[in-house]
Amino acid sequence: MEAIKLNQTVQLDKAVRVYVNKVEKESGYKLINKNITYNDFFKNRMLLVHAIREGVSFDFFSLIKEKTPFNDEDWASFLGISTKSLQRNKAKESFVFKPIQSEKIFELAEVTNLGNEVFDDENSFYSWLNMPSFALGNLKPMELLKDSYGKEMVLGELYKIDQGIFI
């Protein structure tokens, strides 16, 4: 299992580097450190802005999707499209999501990335996402991920958990 996770991480890191090179060529934005990782990607807000504007390819999305707890129905709902549209997009060669959808993909990837770090265990993080939280108005964190403000609340709660603040 650890070998599979390591392979996923290596694939994602490579995909991020390829994607960032494309973003640099298209937008003119230049990175000093070309050896960027998936984790580093979310720390560079200016890079994220340029990446969102370029859009996410379906191939890159597929790699991100493997790292998240969300199924096709969840993703379709988050992206504001039908599951059938998501499947059709998968079949299209060189499909690129619109910037608004790309932003949502990166937001959810960021939450998942932090959640997996905080909980050290994907199953614990996924369980937390689906349990009502007093700190989040007795809503499930998963329910709040549908919009940006909710996502910020979930990230805030994850940071608090990471710091040992359980209020």
Task: Please place each PLM-identified region on the residue numbering.
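Non-transmembrane "mature" sequence context
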Residues: 1-167
